[in-house]
C-alpha cells in the first residue's frame, strides 16, 4: 500500500516558526511543504476552478511523487447538491486532469443539511468521469448499505471523516482510502490507532490518502509526521 499523508492546505502564515521558517516567503511554502510530505488537500478549488497557470505552478513546485487532493466546487456540492451540474462537473474535471499523475482524489464534501437521496447520487455517479473520488457525507442519513453499495459499484471511496460532531462508519467502498482526521486534538495513542486501522486495510487498499486538520497552532504537520513514522515502522 502507498501512503499519502499530509494536511488540508499548506499556505498558512500561522505555521511560521513552528513548521515553516519565520522568514520563508509565502511563494516558497509549497516547495518547502512538498519536500516533507507527499500530498495536500486543496480547499481553493471549492471556491473557484483553478486557472491553467495555477495548475502549472502546482506541478512546477512539487516533485513527481506528490499528489493534490482537490475539493470539488461548491457549485456542484452545495448549490446544485449534485443535481443538473454536468457542465460544471465536466469542465472542472477537464481542468484538473492537467495535473496528470499529481492528481489525487477529488473530494465531494456535501453540506450537513443535504439528506440522503440515493437516486440523485446514482445519477451523479453515472456522470462522474473515470477518476478517483471520495464522498464526505455530513448527514448521518447517508450512512447505510444502499449508499455504500452505490459507491462500491463505481469504485468511489467513502471519505472516513473523524470530527467532533460526526464519525463516519469505516466502510470500505473502493480500492483506495480517504481519511480526514478533523478533531481538535489527537494524542499519540489516537494517531497510533488510526495508523493501525490504515495498516489493516492493506489487502483492500492500494493507496491511502490521509489528511489532518491544519490548525493554527501548526499541530497538523506534526500529527502527519507521527503517522508517517508509525506506518514506516510497521
Language model region names:
Residues 1-234:
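Residues lining hydrophobic/aromatic ligand-binding pockets adjacent to catalytic sites
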Amino acid at each position: 500500500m502507498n501512503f499519502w499523508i499530509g494536511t488540508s492546505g499548506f499556505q498558512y502564515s500561522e505555521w511560521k516558526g513552528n513548521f515553516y521558517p519565520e522568514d520563508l516567503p509565502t511563494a516558497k511554502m509549497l516547495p518547502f511543504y512538498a519536500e516533507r510530505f507527499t500530498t495536500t488537500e486543496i480547499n481553493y478549488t471549492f471556491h473557484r476552478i483553478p486557472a491553467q497557470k495555477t495548475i502549472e505552478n502546482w506541478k512546477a513546485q512539487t516533485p513527481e511523487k506528490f499528489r493534490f487532493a482537490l475539493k470539488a466546487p461548491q457549485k456542484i456540492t452545495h448549490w446544485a447538491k449534485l443535481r443538473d451540474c454536468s457542465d460544471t462537473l465536466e469542465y472542472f474535471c477537464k481542468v484538473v486532469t492537467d495535473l496528470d499523475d499529481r492528481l489525487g482524489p477529488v473530494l465531494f464534501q456535501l453540506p450537513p443539511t443535504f439528506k440522503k437521496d440515493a437516486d440523485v447520487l446514482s445519477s451523479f455517479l453515472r456522470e462522474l468521469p473515470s477518476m478517483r473520488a471520495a464522498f464526505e457525507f455530513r448527514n448521518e442519513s447517508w450512512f447505510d448499505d444502499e449508499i455504500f453499495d452505490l459507491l462500491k459499484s463505481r469504485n468511489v471511496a467513502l471519505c472516513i471523516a473523524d470530527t467532533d460532531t460526526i464519525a463516519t462508519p469505516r466502510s470500505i467502498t473502493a480500492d483506495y482510502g480517504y481519511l480526514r482526521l478533523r478533531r481538535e486534538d489527537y494524542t499519540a495513542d489516537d494517531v497510533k490507532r488510526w495508523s493501525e486501522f490504515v495498516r489493516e486495510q492493506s489487502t483492500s487498499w492500494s493507496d491511502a490518502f490521509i489528511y489532518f486538520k491544519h490548525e493554527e497552532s501548526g499541530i497538523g504537520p506534526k500529527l502527519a509526521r507521527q503517522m508517517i513514522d508509525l506506518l514506516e515502522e510497521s
